[in-house]
Every structure is written in structure tokens, then in C-alpha cells.
UniProtKB/Swiss-Prot annotation:
Annotated PANTHER family: TETRATRICOPEPTIDE REPEAT PROTEIN 39 FAMILY MEMBER, TETRATRICOPEPTIDE REPEAT PROTEIN 39A
Keywords: Repeat, TPR repeat
Name under which the protein is recorded: Tetratricopeptide repeat protein 39A
Gene from which this protein is expressed: Ttc39a
Record InterPro entries: Iml2/TPR_39 (IPR019412), TPR-like_helical_dom_sf (IPR011990), TPR_rpt (IPR019734)
CC annotations in GO: centrosome
Organism: Mus musculus (Mouse)
Length: 578
């Protein structure tokens, strides 16, 4: 590749000019290494002097801020990362060829004029596309229903189109590898992989909008690109690893069916955990993996270890507190779960409404003989929740909206208590897929749910009776499913649809009951029936709590069911042909 044009203007520690991309990338890898050994401030300080001149220093600085924002969900972190990413994007723009990649590159790639681009200009393209991609990711953090993501479609389209062109370039016979080729190719794999993976997960209604303007995603191709990027020894290798770990331990779990490729996650994590045994980020992922496997005590140890590993980045502790809160919920240790919800409500600003709601939810699980700490009263806490509503970039968090809606029944002078609010929120975060790995935990949860069911049956009829009964049946059905009591689970899920017209407030229960029944059928190989149920859940219900999250799960389940059907049909054809 030609080397004409300006170079990346950098300065070393003594103020001498550094002219090569190779040296810039080496310095950025050093900064990433500092970051991964919990030296967060040192990493940023190391990069900062060069962020106004070097696109890689600027992008790495912004990427570290974005990783912090994605780990903490803190509104200030999100704002800071977004502003820095904009600055990095402007700097990359200055280093790009004057005509944009999307305008001119598709014409050039088919002619022997690729050497019109310097190596630096090609790197500027991948860095520019990465800035756009990371800004889109920040938007998703703020707005789970993707409306803003679509509104910013031109930016996203430019990024997507650039990655597609760069992917074609990497595979072109006319491409000659520059000195920093592995870093460039790693950047392409990161972007192409991220786009394909993300687009493959989106609900159909959003996909239709995106595909209308040329977007499409292939999950398998996305995973392959990221896996290749993760093993490529490039500047972006660790970013590919982190994205894959997020996908395997969070996205497929919270926005999917909980059908996690845990072996792949462990394989990805192992070399990094060996290299950075005290690295907080990797200890955190180790905790997530243990939790997903149902090894709750081991998960607790990992999260505690993660907190002990560093004291500088306190907000990273908050992520561990959130996970520890759920670990103790799974174990039915309400006082410990309350302790972590209380810590979060005092120390973290992501969603005070959610944290106070969880405090109240855990207090409501205490027995009459239990000591209620600090004089807190669950009714007063529930009443405080609606007044704590927070907006990030003009949007309310879906979990917060859910907590506020549920708390409103406490605003009446003589409120009717929520039956099992902590266990309901546990469903929203797909926690039953965790306890389902351990029959003892599932049995314990079923016991709590059955007691709540008995209390509802003994109590007087009220305006919430149908809603509360259906909630209990949904959660009971999940426990029964994981205990192998399939017929009973199906009966509980079906009874929710049968009582659809009686439900007054918790309309989310109906599409979610259909989703859970579909997942139950899929486990029995009844994929055609499952697809019909999923289609009904998707098409027939609108404007209910956590709708976007449910649609993500429906999409994941539909893809899984169709894939199983296709595999079954292929097996049938093979056996017939034999």
C-alpha cells in the first residue's frame, strides 16, 4: 500500500516527534495493558497528551471511557465517553482521504488504484467507523428500545457501509499489507463482527426498518469475525474478547433465551485471567460465568475478589454489588440482598428508583420476626419510588419505568402489597435460568412462590387479584419447568392466557407467558407449535412493561426454533437419502 501523504503526528515522552502508526499502536497497547491491570487513571494519563494529534490515542482514550460507561451505566460516564468519542471522530475525519470511503471507496476497490490510499488513510477509515459504532453502542445504553439508534441511522449506516467496504478490501487480491496490517484487520473484524451480531439480535420490527435501508446481520458470521479478531494478536483483540464475553454472559442472557455458550466464554476468558489474575474486568466476567453455571458461592467469591482487586474505580464495585444482590436473591438470603441494594441506593446514581424499589422488595420478603434495619419501612420506600424518576438523554430506563408502575399501588392510603416483588424483578433479569441449574435453589424458590400463592388464595378478592395470581403462576411455572415437572409448568403458563381478560395492570404477563410456553415446547422438540406462540406474542400485544426486552427474547427464541426445525429437516432428508 502506498505511503504518500501526511503521517500520524505523535510525540513521545520527551516531546520528540513519532511518525509511525506502528509506534502509535504500540503506545496504545501499553495503555490498554495499564487499564487491564486496574491502573485506570495511569492509562488515561499516558494517552491524554497525544489525544489532540493521534487518532489512535484519541480513539483508545475514548474507548477506555466508553468501557467504563458500559460497566457502570453512570449517566456522567456515558456523557463524558460520548463527548470524547465525538472528538476522536473529528480527529479521524481530518486524517481521512478527502472524499469519503462510502462515496469513493466502492468505486476504487474494483480498479487497480487502491494505492491512492496511504496506510494511514486506511487506518483513519477503520477508526472513523469505530467511533460511529461506539457512539451507537452508547445510544443503546441510554435507550434499550433502539428508537434513537434508528434516528441516528445515517451515522450508523455510514459506519456499517465503511466496514463492509473495508471487509471487501481485506479479502481483495489488490490489497497489499502494510506494516500495521494486523491492527487494521483486527479493526475490520471487530466492526463487521459487532454489526452482524447486533443486527442478528434485533427484534423483527426494528430489523425491517434497518433492512429497508440496506442493513442485515448474520449471527454466525459475526461470531466468527469476532473470534478471529480475538485470536489475532492485534490492538483490537482484547476488545473482540470483551464484546464476545458481553454477548455470552449478558446479551444472550438478559436479551435472549439464556441459552449461553458457556464453554466458549470460559475458553475466551482463561488466557486473560492467567495474564491478569487481579484484573477487575476479567474477575467480574469470571463471576458472571460462575453465576450462569449456577455456582452461586463461587460467583460470590469472584465478585468479592473483584472488589478487593482495586479501590480506584469505585463504580466498578457497584457492578459487583448488583451481581452480589442477585446472587443472594437466588439463595433466598433477603438480608444480604437488601444490604447490597442499600449500598447501591447510597453510592450509585444509575437508577435510584430501581435500587429503592429493590430495597423495599427485599424488606417485604423479611419474616415478621426479622429485624428490619435502620427503621426502613417497605411501604414508605415503595411510595418514594415514583419521585425518583431519572431521565438519561431524555429517556427513562425501562427497568425504572417498571419499578415505578409497580410501586404506584402503594400510593393509596391502605395499599395492597405486591406478593413477591423481588422474585418478579428476578424474572425481568432472567434469573430463573440461573437457579434452574441448581435443583436445591429452584426448590427453595418454589417454596417461597407456593407460600405466596397460598396467601393470595386465603386473602380477600381485590382489584389486583387476577394480576397477582397470574404473576405467581408465571414464576411457579418457571420453577416447575426447571425441576422437570413439564405438565404442571405448561398448566401454569396456559392458565395466564386463559385469564387474559381479567388482568387489569400487568399486561406484560400475557406475552411473557406465551414466550415461556414456547420455550417449554422447544425443549420438547415442538418447534412448530413454539413458533406459532412466539408469533402471537409478538403480533398481538403492544404497549406493555418491558416490551422491548420481551421482543428481544422473542426474536432470540424464534431464531433458535427455526434453526432447530431446519436442522431436523436436514437430518430427515439425510436419513431418507441413505
Amino acid at each position: 500500500m502506498g505511503q504518500k501523504g501526511h503521517k500520524d503526528s505523535l510525540y513521545d515522552c520527551k516531546g520528540s516527534p513519532v511518525s509511525s502508526l506502528h509506534e502509535a499502536l504500540d503506545q496504545c497497547m501499553t495503555a490498554l495493558d495499564l487499564f487491564l491491570t486496574n491502573q485506570f487513571s495511569e492509562a488515561l494519563s499516558y494517552l491524554k497528551p497525544r489525544t489532540k494529534e493521534s487518532m489512535y490515542h484519541s480513539l483508545t482514550y475514548a474507548t477506555i471511557l466508553e468501557m467504563q460507561a458500559m460497566m457502570t451505566f453512570d449517566p456522567q460516564d456515558i456523557l463524558l465517553a460520548g463527548n470524547m468519542m465525538k472528538e476522536a471522530q473529528s480527529l479521524c475525519q481530518r486524517h481521512r482521504r478527502k472524499s469519503s470511503m462510502t462515496d469513493s471507496f466502492s468505486n476504487l476497490v474494483h480498479r487497480p488504484t487502491i494505492d491512492q490510499f496511504t496506510e494511514e488513510e486506511i487506518h483513519a477509515e477503520v477508526c472513523y467507523a469505530e467511533c460511529l459504532l461506539q457512539r451507537a453502542a452508547l445510544t443503546f445504553l441510554q435507550d434499550e428500545n433502539m428508537v434513537s439508534f434508528i434516528k441516528g441511522g445515517i451515522k450508523v449506516r455510514n459506519s456499517y457501509q465503511t466496514y463492509k467496504e473495508l471487509d471487501s478490501l481485506v479479502q481483495s487480491s489488490q490489497y497489499s499489507k502494510g506494516e500495521s496490517h494486523r491492527h487494521f484487520e483486527g479493526g475490520v473484524k471487530l466492526g463487521v463482527g459487532a454489526f452482524n451480531l447486533t443486527l442478528s439480535m434485533l427484534p423483527t420490527r426494528i430489523l425491517r426498518l434497518l433492512e429497508f435501508v440496506g442493513f442485515s446481520g448474520n449471527k454466525d458470521y459475526g461470531l466468527l469475525q469476532l473470534e478471529e479478531g480475538a485470536t489475532g494478536h492485534s490492538f483490537r483483540a482484547v476488545l473482540c474478547v470483551m464484546l464476545l464475553l458481553c454477548y455470552h454472559t449478558f446479551l444472550t442472557f438478559v436479551l435472549g433465551t439464556g441459552n449461553v455458550n458457556i464453554e466458549e466464554a470460559e475458553k475466551l476468558l482463561k488466557p486473560y485471567l492467567n495474564r491478569y489474575p487481579k484484573g477487575a474486568i476479567f474477575l467480574f466476567f469470571a463471576g458472571r460465568i460462575e453465576a450462569i453455571k449456577g455456582n452461586i458461592d463461587a460467583a460470590v467469591r469472584r465478585f468479592e475478589e473483584c472488589c478487593e482487586a482495586q479501590q480506584h474505580w469505585k463504580q466498578f464495585h457497584h457492578m459487583c454489588y448488583w451481581e452480589l444482590m442477585w446472587c443472594f436473591t437466588y439463595k433466598g438470603q433477603w438480608k444480604m440482598a437488601y444490604f447490597y441494594a442499600d449500598l447501591l441506593s447510597k453510592e450509585n446514581s444509575w437508577s435510584k428508583a430501581t435500587y429503592i424499589y429493590m430495597k423495599a422488595a427485599y424488606l417485604s420478603m423479611f419474616g415478621k420476626e426479622d429485624y428490619k434495619p435502620f427503621g426502613d419501612n417497605e411501604v414508605e420506600l415503595f411510595r418514594a419510588v415514583p419521585g425518583l424518576k431519572l431521565k438519561i438523554a431524555g429517556k427513562s430506563l425501562p427497568t425504572e419505568k417498571f419499578a415505578i408502575r409497580k410501586s404506584r399501588r402503594y400510593l393509596s392510603p391502605n395499599p395492597i402489597s405486591l406478593p413477591i416483588p423481588a422474585l418478579e424483578m428476578m424474572y425481568i433479569w432472567n434469573g430463573y435460568a440461573v437457579i434452574g441449574k441448581q435443583p436445591t435453589l429452584t426448590d427453595g424458590m418454589l417454596e417461597v412462590i407456593t407460600k405466596a400463592e397460598e396467601m393470595l388464595a386465603m386473602g380477600p378478592e381485590n382489584e389486583y387479584s387476577a394480576d397477582d395470581d397470574c404473576l405467581v403462576k408465571l414464576l411457579k411455572g418457571l420453577c416447575l419447568k426447571y425441576l422437570g415437572r413439564i405438565q404442571e409448568a405448561e398448566e401454569n403458563f396456559r392458565s395466564i392466557s386463559a385469564n387474559e381478560k381479567k388482568i387489569k395492570y400487568d399486561h406484560y404477563l400475557i406475552p411473557n407467558a406465551l414466550l415461556e410456553l414456547a420455550l417449554l415446547f422447544m425443549e420438547q422438540g415442538r418447534n412448530e407449535e413454539a413458533i406459532k406462540l412466539l408469533e402471537s406474542a409478538k403480533q398481538n400485544y403492544k404497549n406493555y412493561s418491558m416490551e422491548s426486552r420481551t421482543h428481544f427474547r422473542i426474536q432470540a427464541a424464534t431464531l433458535q426454533a427455526r434453526s432447530s426445525l431446519e436442522d431436523g429437516n436436514r437430518s430427515l432428508v439425510s436419513s431418507v437419502s441413505l
